[in-house]
Amino acid sequence: MLQPKKTKFRRQQKGSQKGNAQRGNQLAFGSFGIKSLETKWITGRQIEAARIAVTRYMQRQGQIWIRIFPDKPITRKPADVRMGKGKGAPEGFVAPVTPGRIIIEAEGVPYEVAKEALRLAAQKLPVTTKFIVRRDYDAQNQNA
């Protein structure tokens, strides 16, 4: 499961997620990608499920890049515990995602294969996404 090796603090405030992504909102590595259209927290398990779906469909051809990493600790109090008495114990890590953030990128496969693989990955994620293609992508010359 994805999580940081070491964190400076064990607990973190929730924070607010307003506005669109200011960074990580353009394709940087591949020709294809999926872009988030809403604000949500994505867990390491969800990212891993999406990664497995993509690699299985692409049959280990091409290359993929995961552009998000779960580095925000989430706490939870046990069941049947009253309010107060301090913050709960750390339960796991999430990656905060805002609209416009690129989640996964792919390269080295035909357009149809990339579109279907990233559609399968998007089904594993809790956010609505949009399939995007690099602006200078030429379908005629890319017969991978």
UniProtKB/Swiss-Prot annotation:
Entry-linked Pfam families: Ribosomal_L16 (PF00252)
UniProt biased composition (Basic residues): 1-13
Region spans: Disordered: 1-24
Skewed-composition ranges (Polar residues): 14-24
InterPro entries: Ribosomal_uL16, Ribosomal_uL16_bact-type, Ribosomal_uL16_CS, Ribosomal_uL16_dom, Ribosomal_uL16_sf
Superkingdom of the organism of origin: Bacteria
Cellular component terms (Gene Ontology): cytosolic large ribosomal subunit
Keywords: Ribonucleoprotein, Ribosomal protein, RNA-binding, rRNA-binding, tRNA-binding
Gene Ontology terms, MF aspect: rRNA binding; structural constituent of ribosome; tRNA binding
GO-annotated biological processes: translation
NCBIfam families to which the protein is assigned, alphabetical: rplP_bact
Summary of subunit composition and partner proteins: Part of the 50S ribosomal subunit.
Known role: Binds 23S rRNA and is also seen to make contacts with the A and possibly P site tRNAs.
Family to which the UniProt record says this protein belongs: Belongs to the universal ribosomal protein uL16 family.
Protein name per Swiss-Prot or TrEMBL: Large ribosomal subunit protein uL16
Gene label: rplP
